[in-house]
Amino acid sequence: MNQSDSSLMDLPLEIHLSLLEYVPNELRAVNKYFYVLHNHSYKEKSLAWIAEDNYIWAVVKHSLCLYVKSLDPLRQHAREIIQETKEPGFNVPLCMTKYIADSWYIVYNALQYPGKIINMGWDKYTKSQDSNGSDSTSNFNSRPKERTLMQSLTALPVNFWSRRKDEPTPVNVWFYVKNAHVARYIPKIITEIGICNYGPKQIVASAGYINELITSEGIYCVNLGHLPRLYDEQIFEGTGTTHLPLELKAIDRTDSDVCINGDLVLLGYDFIPYQISKPWLLFRIEPVNSIEAIFNYSECSFSYQFAWSLACLQSEEKISFPRDTIIGHGLPYKPSKLIRIFVYKHPEQKQDLGQEIALPNWNTPYLRR
């Protein structure tokens, strides 16, 4: 330990905790003491928000542990700094449970923000695209004017908008585009967002000229704007409700077969602000066959199971969603380095590709303070 480290360690605990609020990522990397203290501070935040005896923990415990465990290729050695934990079990206290007690920073973020949503039907379209060979202009009269491409859930904290304040949350949709010709259909795929079995739904969609920006095959992330405010938070004050099931439905209004023959495949959604300083419209990633590096099936399963349980518990109406169909699918989560090619809202803004290459993997969990 050098002199500066020694001087830092001589400061009182209150100062250490205060410093963690300002520079958490930098300070927790200093030594084991600050890593453990950082973990403890997020345990306190989590349990101050959702008490240990709240039913929410029983709802999420199993799938949350599986999600955190799936991140071990990224952080197993760091997680194992926190010792004296036990394998997850029904009778194991929360604060002793492996993958929770050693990972409160990730747990806090997983509960504070809506998780990624994957379209579980994406692979059947991409696998059948060569055999189908259907013409997007054929059988016009027999095609429905509107079809649901996917419908899914993720959990949203009740106080989400009051906490975010001036930090709007984006809604991003992911597509596989087989060729530039089919990109013209993207603006006709709209997304209906609302709380499951509660209140009105709102619509978000891509810019009408988005097809002009897509010039080749690839996986594209398209910005649909911001998550709309869906309810008055005051309605839930004093009810003990901490989360609500957020429902997203993708609706195909293309009057074509491009979304079912593999030419244009909706992969899923996320709510991550990939670049805050420059408003962006879309980005393309390399290589094309990289969906398992974008969507962690364990994360998507946790988000869905959490929201599905909330919908069942909170609604008097019948829930049309099945139990989790995500768990057990997909490859183990191994985020590889993917390069993003951004298209910005303001054409004069350009991307620094050197910085993009130098940045750490962007497709690891997005963790806020």
From Swiss-Prot:
GO terms for molecular function: protein-macromolecule adaptor activity. Keywords: Ubl conjugation, Ubl conjugation pathway. Disruption phenotype: Leads to poor ubiquitination of CIT2 and accumulation of citrate in the cells. Residues 8-45 form the F-box domain. The keyword Ubl conjugation applies. GO terms for cellular component: SCF ubiquitin ligase complex. Monoubiquitinated by UBC4. Pathway: Protein modification; protein ubiquitination. The keyword Ubl conjugation applies. Transmembrane segments: none annotated. Induction: Expression is down-regulated by the presence of C2-compounds such as acetate. One of its GO terms (biological process) is SCF-dependent proteasomal ubiquitin-dependent protein catabolic process. Component of the SCF(UCC1) E3 ubiquitin-protein ligase complex composed of CDC53, SKP1, RBX1 and UCC1. Interacts with CIT2. Substrate recognition component of the SKP1-CUL1-F-box protein E3 ubiquitin-protein ligase complex SCF(UCC1) which mediates the ubiquitination and subsequent proteasomal degradation of target proteins. The SCF(UCC1) complex acts as a metabolic switch for the glyoxylate cycle and regulates the level of CIT2 protein to maintain citrate homeostasis. This is F-box protein UCC1. It comes from Saccharomyces cerevisiae (strain ATCC 204508 / S288c) (Baker's yeast).
